[in-house]
C-alpha cells in the first residue's frame, strides 16, 4: 500500500535521520572501539555512497518528454493537456511533480521525487548501498555481541557501558532498516529485472488479469485490434468468431507485455551496462521515449489472430477511462439443470464496474497511489 505523509518533508527527514543515527552512531560508539583504520575508511566510504546516491535520486529529474515528440503508429496516442505534449510509451503525468515522467515507476515519498527513466539507476543504487551498508554493519555488530558475550565473565578493562547500550539500540534498528529496504529492492528487481515492468505496469498487469478472470478482456482487445487494423476484416472474422466461442482461452495466448525481453536485457535497459551499475553518475542507455521490445510485439499481417493481438501496445485494452456496464449487478444467479431450478448467491466484485482510472488491486492501490494524475490519463 502506498505511504502518504501529512508533511511531505518527513519523507526525506526520516530516512536521513535513520542513516545518520545508525551509520555514524554505530561508528562512534561501537565500531571505533575495535575496527582497524582501513576497515573504518571502508565503512565510511559505504556511508558516503548512500548520501551521494540519495542526493542524486532526490535531485535528478526523472525524465521529461521532448516538446516535439510524436508517437509512432505502433503506440497508443496519449496527449497531456497540461504539459501540451504527447506522452511517450510508459510515460504518465505525476500530480505531485506536475510534469509528465518518462517510464514512470512511482512517485516516491522518501525522495520527494518521481522514480522514472532518468533517475531509476540512482534510486536502485541508493537502495543497494543502504542494504550493503546495513548488512555489513549487522555482521560487525553480531560479531561484537558474540565476543562480548563470550568474555562476559572475565575481568577486562575494555568494557564500555555506552558501547553495550548502543549495541542494544543499533542492532534491532539496523536489522529493521535492512529488512524493509531489502523488500523494496526485491520488488524492484522482481518487476524491472525479471519482468521488465515498472510498478505502474505491474499494477496494470493485475488489472488486465482481473479483466481476463471476469471473461471481459478478450472482447476488448479484439475491439482494439480491429480499430487499429481494420484491414484484417473480413478475412479474419471467422478466426475471431472461433476464438470468442471458445470456453476458455489462456491470457498468455493473446496478450503480451512487450517490454519483457529477457532478465539481462531488462536490467541493462533500466540500469545501463553492468560495469557502470555502481558508478554514481551512470545513466540508462536510452533517452526514454522508446524501448526495446520482445519479438511477439512485432505485427505480421499473415499471422494468426492470437499473434496479432499480441502486437497491441501496452495496455492491450487501450488507455480507456470507462469500462462496459455489467447488467443489474445482482448477486443472485439462477441455473436450470436437469429440470430443477437452482438459485445461488454469486459474489460480485465492486471493481467490476470501475474503469482503468478508478480500478484498485487487492492492496487497495489505484493509479493515483503511484502518483499518476488520473484526470490526464
From Swiss-Prot:
Is this entry keyworded Metal-binding? no
The DHHC domain sits at 78-128
Where are the Cytoplasmic topological domains? 1-9, 144-163
Active site: residue positions: 108 (s-palmitoyl cysteine intermediate)
Q: Which Gene Ontology terms of cellular component type are present?
A: endoplasmic reticulum membrane
Query: Record's family?
Result: Belongs to the DHHC palmitoyltransferase family. PFA4 subfamily.
Q: What is known of its domains?
A: The DHHC domain is required for palmitoyltransferase activity.
Q: What does this protein do?
A: Mediates the reversible addition of palmitate to target proteins, thereby regulating their membrane association and biological function.
**Under what name is this protein listed?**
Palmitoyltransferase PFA4
Species in which this protein is naturally found: Kluyveromyces lactis (strain ATCC 8585 / CBS 2359 / DSM 70799 / NBRC 1267 / NRRL Y-1140 / WM37) (Yeast)
Amino acid at each position: 500500500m502506498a505511504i502518504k505523509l501529512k508533511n511531505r518533508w518527513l519523507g526525506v527527514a526520516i530516512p536521513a535521520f535513520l542513516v545518520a543515527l545508525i551509520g555514524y552512531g554505530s561508528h562512534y560508539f561501537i565500531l571505533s572501539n575495535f575496527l582497524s583504520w582501513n576497515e573504518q575508511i571502508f565503512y565510511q566510504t559505504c556511508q558516503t555512497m548512500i548520501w551521494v546516491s540519495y542526493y542524486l535520486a532526490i535531485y535528478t529529474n526523472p525524465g521529461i518528454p521532448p516538446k516535439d515528440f510524436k508517437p509512432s503508429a505502433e503506440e497508443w496516442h496519449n496527449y497531456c493537456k497540461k504539459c501540451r505534449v504527447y506522452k511517450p510509451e510508459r510515460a504518465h503525468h505525476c500530480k505531485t511533480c506536475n510534469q509528465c515522467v518518462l517510464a514512470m515507476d512511482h512517485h516516491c515519498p522518501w525522495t520527494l521525487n518521481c522514480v522514472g527513466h532518468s533517475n531509476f539507476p540512482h534510486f536502485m543504487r541508493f537502495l543497494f548501498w543502504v542494504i550493503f551498508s546495513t548488512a555489513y554493519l549487522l555482521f560487525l555488530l553480531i560479531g561484537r555481541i558474540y565476543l562480548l558475550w563470550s568474555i562476559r565473565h572475565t575481568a577486562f578493562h575494555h568494557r564500555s557501558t555506552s558501547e553495550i547500550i548502543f549495541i542494544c539500540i543499533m542492532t534491532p534498528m539496523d536489522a529493521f532498516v535492512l529488512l524493509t529496504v531489502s523488500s523494496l529492492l526485491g520488488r524492484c528487481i522482481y518487476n524491472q529485472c525479471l519482468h521488465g515492468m515498472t510498478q505502474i505496469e505491474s499494477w496494470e498487469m493485475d488489472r488486465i488479469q482481473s479483466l481476463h478472470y471476469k471473461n471481459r478482456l478478450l472482447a476488448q482487445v479484439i475491439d482494439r485490434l480491429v480499430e487499429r487494423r481494420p484491414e484484417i476484416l473480413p478475412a479474419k472474422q471467422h478466426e475471431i468468431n472461433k476464438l470468442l466461442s471458445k470456453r476458455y482461452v489462456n491470457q498468455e495466448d493473446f496478450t503480451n507485455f512487450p517490454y519483457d525481453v529477457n532478465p539481462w536485457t531488462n536490467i541493462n535497459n533500466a540500469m545501463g551496462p553492468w560495469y557502470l551499475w555502481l558508478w554514481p553518475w551512470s545513466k540508462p542507455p536510452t533517452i526514454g521515449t522508446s524501448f526495446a521490445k520482445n519479438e511477439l510485439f512485432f505485427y505480421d499481417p499473415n499471422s494468426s489472430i492470437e499473434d496479432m493481438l499480441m502486437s497491441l501496445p501496452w495496455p492491450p485494452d487501450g488507455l480507456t477511462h470507462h469500462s462496459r456496464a455489467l447488467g443489474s449487478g445482482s448477486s443472485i444467479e439462477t441455473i436450470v439443470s436437469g429440470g430443477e431450478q437452482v438459485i445461488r448467491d454469486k459474489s460480485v466484485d465492486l471493481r467490476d464496474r470501475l474503469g482503468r482510472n478508478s480500478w484498485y488491486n487487492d492492496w487497495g492501490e489505484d493509479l493515483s497511489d503511484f502518483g499518476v494524475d488520473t484526470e490526464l490519463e
